[in-house]
Amino acid sequence: MKHVAAYLLLVSAGNTSPSAEDVKKVLAAADIQADEERLSVLIKELEGKDVNEVIAEGSKKLASVPSGGAAPAAAAGGAAAGGAAEEKAEDKPAEKDEESDDDMGFGLFD
């Protein structure tokens, strides 16, 4: 991830096609050692591509992934309750163990 961040930093600074050496310099400025193998794969995968198009394509792919959006919102609301919510959470682990066997209709080997 650090390699991608350094690459995107260079692109946002105006370098449309950063080299491995450019990325290494950015990482070295933050006292981070570059992983040569990962860096070479990153440079090879992004060579000749517009980063904005790659990001847009990735966003489209992520948008099509089901995320079960209601569950995190419910969890966030419970966390805002404070100490009372923590006490209730300690009382419920036994119920969660029973629910963990429920595959919600998605059998792994069906």
Swiss-Prot record:
Gene Ontology annotations for the cellular component aspect, listed alphabetically: cytosolic large ribosomal subunit; ribosome
Keyword Cytoplasm: yes
Keywords: Cytoplasm, Fatty acid biosynthesis, Fatty acid metabolism, Lipid biosynthesis, Lipid metabolism, Phosphopantetheine, Phosphoprotein, Ribonucleoprotein, Ribosomal protein
O-(pantetheine 4'-phosphoryl)serine modifications at: 59
Result of changing residue 100 to A: No change in acylation capacity
Biased composition (Basic and acidic residues): 85-95
Compartments it resides in: Cytoplasm
Domain of life: Eukaryota
Effect listed in the UniProt record for changing residue 12 to A: No change in acylation capacity
Modified sites of kind Phosphoserine: 100
Extent of Low complexity compositional bias: 63-84
Job description of the protein: Probable bifunctional protein. The phosphorylated protein plays an important role in the elongation step of protein synthesis. The phosphopantetheinylated protein acts as an acyl carrier protein.
Assembly information from the UniProt record: The phosphorylated form is part of the ribosomal stalk involved in the interaction of the elongation factors with the ribosome during protein synthesis. The phosphopantetheinylated form is part of the 10S triacylglycerol biosynthetic complex involved in de novo fatty acid biosynthesis.
Protein name, as recorded: Large ribosomal subunit protein P2
Organism from which the protein derives: Rhodotorula glutinis (Yeast)
